[in-house]
Regions:
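Subset of outer-membrane beta-barrel
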Residues: 19-447
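Sec/Tat signal peptide C-region and signal peptidase I cleavage site
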Residues: 14-18
Length: 447
């Protein structure tokens, strides 16, 4: 058991999403095919006739408990004062992709891979008892919520079509849709529920649980990253599904040609733009791996004790020891299950102030229900304000973000010709006052 929880610590101690993907740079009018990720309607009647993405990626780590200091993040994150901790690691890679734009219609083809790992409401006293045996006094758990760990990884092949629905001298309305073929390569979750008022008791070097009526569920499908023997296993399909992105954009054209906004789109360009998109509709169906999937019902009456600190160092040992206990019964496991995509509603308002200066307000709202979050990927609700300066070959971006998970962060991004690099939290990380760390990079070209 200790080795499993040490692996969990390693997962959430790396300085690798609470916020919107590619925060800051996603507001650019020059991204081309990359702009389909936030709204598939963006590419029609835009500044790009064609665009090719060679490689873009982002890694992001966020938590609700502690500011990130690389020298002490593990100890700070899991200290007992935090009580309940939640966190997320997200990696997003946009592979070779291209778009062809036009004044009425536009098309794009994208390849993408994404990984989410979530830590949900983990009680730090229970964590310490199972992983490190460092508790010095008895403790009554106050954990009405489900707690656990979730990991999902999948690849996407997407086709985007967008068109102008209406256009006159002052107004443009655009719509777009992306259909995605999904291939899942890993899905795992461990969930513990029903531990409210359960008691952790310390007896010398031994740790016991009493007065507990709880359930423990683990479902696993696809690549086992704790025992990965062949990297090529990641390219195999362990689950399949279909997903969709839907988008709508309204642009209010500039009042006169004298105020013309270069490369803001068709006509004179826009004074402001309003975008609404519903992203990541759909999910992936997996078959459960019977060797690594189980459900146990734990019932330890008051006055009785169940030992926690010697369950074992791997899943096989843990399952064998649980089955031997008089307080544990085995439950049934579904042969298959569905993991939802991180469905979200995205809203943006982008205003052109003149002289190549813009400011964008964007918000992202999670639409994945908390009841289903045990096995699903999801984003935290977030809001951002991004002032930016944009020329044809250079752009500077200053994203200011707030999320339900990691609170306030400030970042910076640069676009220089075909290259862009940035972070939604770099400025906050430099002050050691950030619960989030992220970085992104991209290489693309177009006309």
């Amino acid at each position: 058991m200790k080795k499993i929880f040490i692996a969990l610590i390693a997962l959430f101690s790396v300085g690798v999403s609470a916020q919107q993907p590619f925060s800051g740079i996603r507001s650019s009018s020059y991204l081309g095919v990359q702009s389909t990720l936030s709204n598939p309607a963006n590419i029609v009647a835009s500044s790009k006739k064609w665009d090719v993405n060679l490689l873009s990626f982002q890694v992001n780590f966020a938590n609700n408990a502690t500011d990130l200091k690389l020298s002490s993040v593990k100890d700070d994150l899991f200290k007992l004062e935090n009580d309940k901790i939640s966190g997320v690691i997200n990696a997003d890679v946009l592979g070779p992709s291209f778009m062809v734009g036009g004044s009425k219609f536009a098309f794009a083809l994208t390849s993408r891979a994404r990984v989410f790992a979530h830590l949900n409401n983990l009680n730090t006293h229970l964590f310490k008892a199972l992983s490190e045996n460092k508790l010095t006094e008895n403790y009554v758990l106050q954990s009405p919520e489900n707690q656990g760990v979730t990991a999902n990884g999948w690849s996407e092949i997407g086709g985007t079509f967008s068109m102008v629905l209406f256009q006159d001298l002052n107004h443009v309305i655009k719509a777009g849709v992306t259909a995605k073929l999904l291939q899942g390569f890993t899905s795992s979750y461990v969930q513990i529920n029903g531990l409210k008022d359960a008691k952790i008791e310390i007896d010398g070097n031994e740790v016991y649980l009493s007065n507990a009526n709880a359930g423990v569920v683990m479902l696993n499908s696809g690549v086992d990253f704790t025992n990965l023997k062949n990297v090529s296993d990641i390219t195999k399909s362990y689950g399949k599904g279909i997903g969709f992105d839907l988008g709508l954009v309204y642009e209010r054209q500039l009042e006169s040609a004298d105020d013309w906004c270069p490369n803001c789109g068709i006509g004179r360009g826009y004074r402001y733009k309003i975008g609404v998109s519903l992203l990541d509709i759909g999910g992936i169906k997996y078959s459960s791996n019977p060797q690594n999937s189980f459900q146990y019902l734990l019932n330890v009456p008051a006055g009785k004790r169940f030992r926690l600190d010697n369950l074992g160092d791997n899943l096989t040992q843990i399952q064998e020891n649980l089955k031997k206990s008089e307080y544990v019964k085995t439950g049934g496991i579904s042969d298959s299950y569905k993991a939802s995509l991180p469905t979200s509603l995205n809203l943006i308002f982008d205003y052109y102030a003149g002289s190549r200066f813009f400011v964008e307000f964007a918000s992202q709202f999670n639409l994945v229900s908390k009841e289903d979050s045990a096995k699903n990927a999801y984003y935290a609700n977030s809001y951002s304000l991004t002032p930016r300066f944009e020329g044809k070959y250079f752009g500077f971006y200053l994203p200011l973000n707030y999320s339900d998970l990691s609170k306030f962060n400030a970042g910076v991004a640069l676009r220089m010709g075909p290259l862009f690099v940035g972070s939604g939290s770099a400025l906050s990380v430099l002050t050691n006052k950030s619960k989030q760390a992220d970085v992104y990079f991209g290489l693309r070209f177009g006309l």
